[in-house]
Amino acid sequence: MKIRPLHDRVIIKRKEAESKSAGGIVLTGSAAGKSTRGKVLAVGNGRILDNGETKPLDVKIGDIVIFNDGYGVKVEKIDNDEVLIMSESDILAIVEK
């Protein structure tokens, strides 16, 4: 199944949460928590401005991004991957290599 986000929406596949603490302790269950990083799978055409023009998004397909855990809407699995749909404004940062 393919999904194309509209306007300023972004589809993100959440990355696996770290299973070890900084001290090397293996974390399980809720202690591991949910990752707040993900890979951008698809982006909309852009945000529609008050004057009717469309501003392209800053994030691109393939970017690794950081977002707040409470943001985004979970969607059914797409190609066996659970994805989130969120507005670009809910993304806090792009991880640069």
UniProtKB/Swiss-Prot annotation:
Keywords: Chaperone, Cytoplasm. The keyword Cytoplasm applies. One of its GO terms (cellular component) is cytoplasm. Transmembrane segments: none annotated. One of its GO terms (biological process) is chaperone cofactor-dependent protein refolding. One of its GO terms (molecular function) is protein-folding chaperone binding. InterPro entries: Chaperonin_GroES (IPR020818), Chaperonin_GroES_sf (IPR037124), Chaprnonin_Cpn10_CS (IPR018369), GroES-like_sf (IPR011032). It is found in: Cytoplasm. It holds the Pfam family Cpn10. HAMAP family: CH10. PANTHER family: 10 KDA HEAT SHOCK PROTEIN, CO-CHAPERONIN GROES. Together with the chaperonin GroEL, plays an essential role in assisting protein folding. The GroEL-GroES system forms a nano-cage that allows encapsulation of the non-native substrate proteins and provides a physical environment optimized to promote and accelerate protein folding. GroES binds to the apical surface of the GroEL ring, thereby capping the opening of the GroEL channel. Heptamer of 7 subunits arranged in a ring. Interacts with the chaperonin GroEL. Belongs to the GroES chaperonin family. This is Co-chaperonin GroES. It comes from Wigglesworthia glossinidia brevipalpis. The lineage of its organism: Bacteria, Pseudomonadati, Pseudomonadota, Gammaproteobacteria, Enterobacterales.
